[in-house]
């Protein structure tokens, strides 16, 4: 390191905390054979959705009398189906110990909104000129052309409006709401940064997948709904997606 650099070091990294919409798998039983079969069936319905998907394994819903979890085996099965385990949630001592043994972080129940973490919090910050705050809501993104299979459209910081058909294999993502004024045959993921008040509106529900703030339903579940093929509004209550007629 040069003398000049040591006298006036510039930071080369920044630590941040964040709240992201990450898929959470809540384990109800420790039967890994059944999990492997059921997970394979889910992946077959929407293979792209499960490709390299970050995952939190939630073991805190397991009954106290449920047997021990083969955590390495569980992580291996998830990885085989495209799910990349980042951490676990657990409250049983044996599950926490198993996570520590394989060097997996154990998370608290909830996260924090993104902010810069300053390790030297005791030092009084120097006053610097503040930049004008960026608007929280960005303009609505409007798409007028058909969205074809393989296309991905993202409305960052706001809503997405599509006034054309959405083909199978196409993917719509928005931090806010999604409106589709035409047949919705692809995937629609609203509130992808954790906005649980986001909604999805479409004139014809024929989607491969719908998701709000990480809670999702695939086409196999949607086809059983009596409003399949109808104009609908989709909202989230707790961890339940509600579908009602427009």
From Swiss-Prot:
Transmembrane segments: none annotated. The keyword Cell cycle applies. Pfam families: MinC_C, MinC_N. Interacts with MinD and FtsZ. Belongs to the MinC family. Cell division inhibitor that blocks the formation of polar Z ring septums. Rapidly oscillates between the poles of the cell to destabilize FtsZ filaments that have formed before they mature into polar Z rings. Prevents FtsZ polymerization. This is Probable septum site-determining protein MinC. It comes from Pseudomonas syringae pv. syringae (strain B728a). The keyword Cell cycle applies. GO terms for biological process: cell morphogenesis; division septum assembly; regulation of cell division; regulation of cell septum assembly. Keywords: Cell cycle, Cell division, Septation.
